């Protein structure tokens, strides 16, 4: 990256960091069981709810316990279950039409990050009916209060239940972009481990490593605060302590509970401190090839950490020691190597590969431009790179025979 652009990026990031204490960040109020929602809706005078989820969650009956409580208390609801991985503008518009048609007055995002992000985007379109989602992409362009929004994560990974971001894919161009504004933070989050116990091992692994990526990128960036560092360290330790237990035994309710807390803490960290190039590259792959976001993050994370080199040794040392991966007596480089090796070991245990056969060489310049546009100047990354410099990651992610 040339010096002028690099200077602009760092000045932008510095200004944003200075503004953090004055911005209206908040955390959602947390419940630990879906049964608590009936009292909330009765108290708020909510009559009709739109539940945004996906077909798999509905098919496997994950909604049933909550719906039983709603039926018992005569709370009306309608279900939109067409959300796809990497939710599209089409999903958002279909769900919005159902909300308006049925005269709903609250929204529940029930599922992984896709369902919760879709719910946030629907809320934004309800709040600003004359403005398209593409006009809201970027930062601080929603402004208006959303309908009452409740997030119920069925995966421990995205942290969307506590963040100000919604990531949406344009149905026509397949460009994936983020909408970032404070009204998108859900009013309530339900961290109920019982809705996560049927999550298969593969998704337990990739969504858990998604949360790890949130925590690590938030911690190594240049816009951390005392609070975000605390949340990122807690999340990192909880993940290393519990992800293998949840992967090996999906019925381990305590491990599931701790992973939900880790995801929430990681979300609290990155919603203020942001992420980095791992996410930017992952989003560009998800938009074009529909590669699941958690899988992309898990695959990319160690290669980017290695590439940052000595600029992050001290911070990785701090994470490694806190998580019990390294000793305080280790020097920074040794501890950083141990931390990255632990991530690689995690990938191997979960049978996550190092490449994606979907990547086409001719797509790389466009994909890297999208990653550059997402990350710069917003993400306070340890090492700045432009689109051309980011191309190396796509080549590293290609199978050898495809290069």
Q: Which residues make up each language-model segment?
A:
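C-terminal charged capping/lid subdomain of soluble metabolic enzymes
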Residues: 2-8, 326-403
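Active-site pocket-lining segment
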Residues: 291-354
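An N-terminal, well-structured beta->alpha segment
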Residues: 1-79, 400-403
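N-terminal small/polar loop signature for handling phosphorylated ligands or for N-terminal nucleophile
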Residues: 50, 58-130, 245-256
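Glycine/threonine-rich beta-strand-loop-alpha-helix active-site module
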Residues: 90-194
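Glycine-rich phosphate/pyrophosphate-binding beta-alpha loops
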Residues: 157, 265-297, 375-378
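Carboxylate- and glycine-rich phosphate/diphosphate-binding segment that chelates Mg2+/Mn2+
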Residues: 165-273
